[in-house]
Regions:
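C-terminal "cap" of GNAT-fold acetyltransferases
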Residues: 157-164, 168-169, 175-194
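Conserved N-terminal entry element of GNAT/NAT acetyltransferase domains
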Residues: 1-38
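Conserved acyl-donor/pantetheine-binding loop and adjacent beta-alpha core of acyl/acetyltransferases
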Residues: 46, 58-62, 71, 75-118, ...
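Conserved GNAT acetyl-CoA-binding A-motif
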Residues: 127, 134-157
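Active-site rim helix/loop that mediates acceptor-substrate recognition in acyltransferases
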Residues: 33-67
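Short beta-strand micro-motifs in enzyme catalytic cores
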Residues: 66-68, 104, 183-189
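Conserved acetyl-CoA pyrophosphate-binding loop and the N-cap/start of the following alpha-helix
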Residues: 117, 121-129
Length: 194
């Protein structure tokens, strides 16, 4: 028996189909393409059928691709949207998730584990790969804005992650926000890289 092989890579154009397999396997044009934080709300609304996929493809061609895909034995199983906070319009304009200081952090805004692969260790590899991507790009720290649920969360809001998940990945609470997810307050958690 061979040991499991885990890899995480930025979602460059050549890995776009793997990203889509995780986040939107059926390729539904109006389904989530992880754009709501990356584009202005009016831009997202104006995108017609098929345009959301194209908008995400364009983001994958930028200097900082918009996230990472984790593979288990060659199969894409996880997605993490991460990038410099300064390049994420919804965060730069947010009155609910304000910067805690002037450190030019990278921000985790979405974590998705593909159906059929949850509770198999994907998240640990995914977050470690996301942090490595940020560190390799010169980020001094990575932030996330999870919740601290008393039990299991509704899957539709679980993309923000949980305090426990980020603590296991070496993050610590550095502040609070005025934002909520699934009715729960969101925290500011950080992992320093320098």
């Amino acid at each position: 028996m061979h040991p499991s092989v885990w890899e995480t890579h930025p979602v460059t154009p050549d890995r776009f189909e793997d990203f889509a397999d995780v986040i939107n396997r059926s390729r539904r044009p109006t389904h989530c393409w992880c754009l709501s934080h990356r584009l202005q709300p009016a831009q997202v609304q104006s995108l017609g059928d098929g345009s959301r996929e194209g908008a995400m493809r364009a983001l994958c061609e930028q200097q900082h691709p918009p996230g990472v895909v984790t593979y288990h034995d060659g199969e894409p199983v996880g997605w993490c949207s991460i990038g410099p906070r300064s390049e994420i319009p919804r965060l730069t304009r947010s009155r609910l998730i304000r910067p805690v200081d002037d450190v030019p952090v990278w921000s985790v805004i979405c974590v998705v584990v593909r159906a059929g692969h949850r509770r198999t260790g994907v998240t640990a590899h995914l977050l470690e790969g996301a942090v490595a991507y940020a560190a390799g790009s010169g980020a001094p720290a990575v932030e996330a804005y999870p919740v601290d649920p008393p039990g299991r969360m509704d899957l539709t809001m679980a993309f923000v992650g949980t305090r426990t998940m980020f603590e296991r990945a070496g993050f610590r609470v550095v502040g609070t926000t005025d934002a909520v997810a699934d009715g729960l307050p969101r925290l500011v958690m950080r992992r320093d890289l320098t």
